Regions:
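Intrinsically disordered, low-complexity segments enriched in small residues
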Residues: 1-13, 17-178
Length: 178
């Protein structure tokens, strides 16, 4: 397949606990500007944010990097990292989290490599305050009512749920168009 044209707009998603941990640290997102002069990783621990030396990690694969950073910090830290493909700015390089989650679309691993950013390591202990506790409980009750009919019916048009939209991850008809 052809590489992405430039300039481009890309988006990707990643499963796992990284996003939740970032929120627990008090952040909704991360914007990274510029390029570090040497390999580093971004360490976020609640309100403390720093760039740490990653010279010893540069050249390592994603699993070895995750293991080294877990040993350096804690098993509770969530880590998103790149491997040699990202370091070398391969256009389809991924960012990996845990053993089975990755951002694989758009070459975001190469973007981190271009910034000399080996990994983002996050630990949050703040929790997430609810802006509307009563509204949240009402939404929980609504989901509970839908789930009472069986979890395999949730999200299917024949279940009679209003305003159901087909998305790229929907299995209703989209999987027949692959």
């Amino acid at each position: 397949p052809r590489g992405y044209p430039t300039p481009m707009w890309a988006s990707a998603t990643m499963g796992g606990y990284f996003g939740a941990e970032l929120k627990y640290a008090g952040y909704d997102g991360i914007i990274i500007h510029g390029r570090a002069p040497a390999p580093c990783y971004l360490l976020i621990e609640d309100d403390r944010v720093s760039l740490e030396d990653a010279g010893d990690l540069w050249g390592k694969g994603i699993f070895a990097t995750q293991q080294a950073l877990k040993a350096r910090h804690s098993p509770h830290h969530q880590i998103a990292t790149i491997g040699p493909a990202g370091e070398n700015r391969v256009r389809f390089a991924t960012i990996a989290h845990r053993l089975n989650n990755a951002i694989g679309n758009g070459g975001f691993g190469g973007v981190l490599g271009a910034k000399n950013l080996k990994a983002i390591v996050v630990r949050g202990t703040k929790g997430v305050p609810l802006a509307d506790p009563q509204g949240f409980l009402q939404a929980v009750r609504q989901v509970w009512q839908m789930a009472k009919g069986g979890i395999y019916r949730i999200g299917k048009p024949d279940a009679g749920y209003p305003h159901l939209a087909c998305t790229h991850a929907c299995s209703v008809r989209c999987f027949t168009r692959v």
